[in-house]
């Protein structure tokens, strides 16, 4: 049964022992104590020679096989467990679930769970925590509620996993109910882990008073407790309170300092962020990256490149995230020499093949109009995930190359382990819209997205369709799309249609759309609406209306955004 795996072990190990000189009585202690490949090989040979193990050896076999990443062997052991009726052994089934959970195969773990006649609290906790740790918070919560209704009594680990999911989903009512249950069961008092989870949950749900109350009532606090309360203050804009806790903290660590830096950056206070960074005993790359990210997110790309230079002069060792962040800044500025320099730096550090860096390089080169460089990055990558495929399709879309975008999309559909997602179709529909691909082709992709891939259209998907219809003079059909997909009250959809009317210089249709936007209340501070209508009236030489619109803009305080350009020198980027 396991002969091929056994042969694989033979090539990896030169252990002299053979199956004939071993028995399960000697193998099991060796597996439990050492868990080496040689011992594992001997165990596999025993099975192949007809020595059937009971549940205890199988538990150790699964653990050791999982530790070495022998997925195929673990799956074969699962088959052996099922075939020989060991499914009812709770401990063994829990070991199988643990393996599948650590192998990111939650569906398989859930199948094992469903086959168990009497799952215990460890079984439930393994699955609940698995869903939460993999970001599937709703499924984790549903399973926790199912546990609560079952005959199995949840323990502190059940509750902390559920609290983590509540925090991410902002389910404060459920979180408060769990808190009450913990108090009733006496699991809150004296339990640092439970207290930390409660602080995190209340902080992420925006209930700072409750977070502080939990913190103050904790009999014992560790570093995680202090970091949780500082992070909660920072997350909710309570910077002064966060600083107060920071100064009370016995031994702030890197996480504490990074939380403060992040809080100052998000509030736009870069000076204090720098101060915290300079006060840090041992800042790591994450500390610097937080400020770098802040600049990029604040659309201060020039400052981001300057700060990146400062990082280099300060001797900071760049990681893949440092490079991907600064590449986003370079892409926004379209400064090719900087991009080439960072690409060379990434190559020197051996990081250019990392997915996060490679996708950022593809994005940067495509935004700079250097599609050949982007293509070279894409095709030379040893492994490509969906993000990279989407980035390349987006690059073609951005540069108006509908033929290559569609060709790459068709290649993606042939990939065995990948399938297009909402972002793939967003890029595909965008390139179809801008390149005047026949409407029936575009509608075909739209229907494929809904029917074949079960993706619900977002307003962004519909906007591409709306623009294409509007640019072809099919304003009535575009309005139908807006209403049919439930975006009649979404200003973004009407904005897209207004842009299409503007491209066709269709003043009559534009006036109808503008009236709808005003009705929705999206016009008060929307410079786009006023500028489009002003330009359309000017095109049709309706100067009186142009004057009226500009007067309304002045009275409403709507200002046209001032444009700027960038010049890059050898050391920095300057704007004018």
From Swiss-Prot:
Residues 493-570 are annotated as: Type E motif. It comes from the Eukaryota. One of its GO terms (biological process) is RNA modification. Keywords: Repeat. InterPro entries: E_motif, Pentatricopeptide_rpt, PPR_At4g14850-like_plant, TPR-like_helical_dom_sf. GO terms for molecular function: RNA binding. PPR repeats lie at residues 20-53, 54-88, 89-119, 120-154, 155-189, 191-225, 226-252, 253-287, 288-318, 319-353, 354-384, 385-419, 421-452, 458-488. Belongs to the PPR family. PCMP-E subfamily. NCBIfam families: PPR. This is Putative pentatricopeptide repeat-containing protein At5g47460.
